[in-house]
């Protein structure tokens, strides 16, 4: 059964990466959309099936302005697919922890941080700093680390959900990986009965990425940073 495969592979990957939870999705972009939907819908069966027809008061997703990029599609489009409304913090060339916090309102549902070469690199707060802001305001932190090589650091830095591409650094099939805190990952998995149905990943993608992660964790790394 597909649900059993999703659960078993997720548990196995989580154990490999020493994280609370993990699930395979169709791609990193789907991971963003489903993560946003997850923090909005949570356990609501009504919102799960009526995400785009029911007004949601607390639907703002705050991210640094310099992270609002087009990576092949706009970040804002993925946020909107998940039912969120994008709110930019800071400026195109800088965003501090204080500027991020200043953009938070009672309508804020989550903080989104994009770790990518597409983004502005200088004068931007770190994932660790974003995590501190998120904790202070009792908000989840979602980190899109699609092409990043390190499968541990962003989770350990305090992110509640971290999204990776299965086909980039991991060199697996076209797929995505979402890791994070148990409750948030479970909410992402629920989206298979919501917007995630249109982003469904097949058995081949799930098993292929699982095998690719096994290999990735044991293979000798040739990092561009070396």
Report residues per predicted region.
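Conserved PLP-enzyme active-site core in the AAT-like
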Residues: 1, 7-217
């Amino acid at each position: 059964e597909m649900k059993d495969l999703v659960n078993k592979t997720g548990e196995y990957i989580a154990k490999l990466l020493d994280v609370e939870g993990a699930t395979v999705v169709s791609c990193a972009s789907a991971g963003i959309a489903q993560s946003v939907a997850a923090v909005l819908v949570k356990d609501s069966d009504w919102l799960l099936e009526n995400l785009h027809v029911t007004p949601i008061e607390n639907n703002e997703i705050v991210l640094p302005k310099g992270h609002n990029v087009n990576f092949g599609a706009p970040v804002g489009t993925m946020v909107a697919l998940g039912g969120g409304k994008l709110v930019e913090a800071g400026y195109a060339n800088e965003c501090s922890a204080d500027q991020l916090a200043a953009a938070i309102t009672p309508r804020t549902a989550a903080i989104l941080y994009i770790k990518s070469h597409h983004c502005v690199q200088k004068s931007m707060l770190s994932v660790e700093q974003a995590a501190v802001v998120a904790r202070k305001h009792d908000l989840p932190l979602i980190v899109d680390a699609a092409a990043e090589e390190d499968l541990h650091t962003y989770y350990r830095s305090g992110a509640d959900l971290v999204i990776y591409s299965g086909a980039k650094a991991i060199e697996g099939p076209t797929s995505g990986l979402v890791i994070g805190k148990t409750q948030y990952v479970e909410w992402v998995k629920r989206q298979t009965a919501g917007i995630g149905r249109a982003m469904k990943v097949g058995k081949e993608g799930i098993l292929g990425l699982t095998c690719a992660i096994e290999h990735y964790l044991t293979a000798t790394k040739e990092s561009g940073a070396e």
